[in-house]
Amino acid sequence: MRCRQRFSSTVGCITVLLVVMVGVVSGQAVAPSPLFIATPLTQVGVFTSGIEGPACDVDGNVYAVNYERQGTIGRIRPDGSGEIYVELPQGSVGNGIRFGSQREMYVADYVGHNVFEVQLRSRAITIYSHDDNMNQPNDLAMAPSGVLYASDPNWAEGSGQIWRIGLDGNATRLFGDMGTTNGIEVSPDGRTLYVGESDERVIWAFDIGVDGTVFGKRVFMRFADHGLDGLRSDVDGNLYVTRYGAGTVLKVSPSGRILQEVNVLGARPSNICLGGMDGRTAYVTEVEHRRLVQFRVDRPGLAWQRLRPE
């Protein structure tokens, strides 16, 4: 702001400055939250130790599994308050969650070898996909076409699989000879599938064909220590990687360069999503304290953007 020349101009500028100062003092103007600094969203212990699978809707709410007790999905509001949104069928326990649109969500049931579809208005739950040859499944990723990809680890044997779930709900095993497949994500252009192997400490990249099959397996990133869990992309194709055991989340460029490392206030972050009202809040499921933590980011999340009305 520039103030010069005549007295009347000076008085006008002083008046504007006073209005701005009063607004700041009265709380009308609020400084933006700093980026990549984690703070708690919920109270300690509102989830079980199975807290996982965060996903964000268009209204700024966050959904995560095992709220209050196993077998539930909780809905957490932007102020940190929450409620049980749905109870999964008896014996089922959820893990990864993905929104297909503003009308339904998909939930990986790692006990019953299912992927559920939950209608958001009615909260009705149906089996979208089932295969007895699945170990779990664990986490989910969605292509622009609506095709789902599921990671499927066998923790006891140290092995894992990748599945493609078509629009008709039919599951096709793409790879059956991998390590402990866990975090999974599709790039913004739908051409690359990322899959993390937790125990092996590696993230693989695959090319995605026009038919949804994957090929061209290659190392995207390796780690010398600790595990890794959830993967999520922003609109620019940067990956957010939860480092289970390290207590951090990495922001990684599409070329594999680490851009940010965020301390998330607990040693065992299990998964992450990007959402909030503007798509620029990261929500992390934090196992050590059984809570959600949050931090602001510089670019909106990919899944959040896809939910926006066109």
Language-model segments: what does each one mean?
Residues G45-V62, L88-D109, N114, D131-S159, ...:
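Beta-rich, blade/repeat-based domains predominating
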